[in-house]
A protein has these predicted regions:
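A charged, solvent-exposed segment within the mature domains of Sec-exported extracytoplasmic proteins
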Residues: 128, 132-176
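Predominantly the C-terminal beta-signal and adjacent terminal strand-loop region
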Residues: 77, 81-88, 104, 155-206
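Cleavable N-terminal export/targeting peptides
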Residues: 1-28, 203-206
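Gram-negative (and chloroplast) outer-membrane scaffold detector with strong preference
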Residues: 25-31, 36-42, 66-140, 194-206
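Residues that define the transmembrane beta-barrel architecture of outer-membrane proteins
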Residues: 28-30, 54-60, 101-107, 149-155, ...
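Extracellular loop and loop/strand-boundary signature of outer-membrane beta-barrel proteins
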Residues: 46-51, 93-100, 141-147, 181-186
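Transmembrane beta-strand segments that form the barrel wall of outer-membrane beta-barrel proteins
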Residues: 36-40, 44-46, 132, 173-181
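Start-of-domain marker
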Residues: 33-35, 43-57
């Protein structure tokens, strides 16, 4: 995590030498942000000798935000996996074959820091705190339908790029990294997400 934060700060520092001209959305703008992409979770399956795993899944995001000025905004956002993570293997406890599935989602609130690069582009850093939700299931011969839901409070850090398409529409590309989801007895792991999306201004008229 420290390496990720250092990388974010380094990129923002390097970009600070570029002449600032404008920004993708004006000050005092309320907007919606819709995006989708691919998420990858660390498996964290210490209770099972893993034979195979599917750790990639599509994920959808929806948020609403407000831009205070050229450099600062705030965003509340939620995301969910569209398919489940899956793993197959042998349980350490009783040597039974088992299948594990998990699906993660989150609800976050995040300050957002902008660095305009030109008249249509900018970098942004989003650092948030909220709920990391997980639904896991373990199927084995002795326990065919074990389910567990978890809700953790954790952080999410996002680094992204935005490009203005029109006066009201902005294209975004970002990478998100979060605290671990789940718990040690089911599926636990950090989550990384690369996604592309659109921001749409709700109150900017021009």
């Amino acid at each position: 995590m420290r390496r990720l934060v250092k990388l974010c700060l380094f990129l923002l520092f390097c970009a600070s030498s570029i002449k600032v001209i404008a920004q993708t959305l004006p000050n005092k703008t309320l907007y919606v942000h819709v995006s989708a992409g691919l998420a990858r979770s660390e498996d964290g399956l210490k209770f099972m000798v893993k034979e195979s795993a599917s750790q990639w899944t599509p994920k959808a995001n929806l948020g609403i935000g407000y831009r205070f000025n050229k450099y600062l905004g705030i965003e509340t956002h939620a995301a969910t996996m569209l398919t489940s993570l899956k793993a197959n293997g042998t349980l350490v406890l009783n040597n039974e074959k088992a299948e594990v599935t998990a699906r993660h989602s989150n609800v976050m609130i995040s300050p957002k820091f902008y660095l305009p690069l030109g008249d249509k582009s900018e970098l942004f850093l989003r650092t948030g705190l909220g709920f990391l939700l997980s639904q896991s299931e373990i199927n084995s011969p002795s326990n065919p339908d074990f389910k567990k839901s978890t809700s953790n409070i954790g952080y999410m850090v996002s680094l992204g790029y935005a490009h203005k398409l029109t006066e009201k529409i902005v294209f975004t590309l970002q990478f998100d990294f979060s605290d671990p989801y789940g718990s040690k007895d089911v599926w636990e792991g950090d989550l990384g997400l690369l996604n592309a999306g659109i921001k749409y201004s709700l109150n900017h008229k021009k």
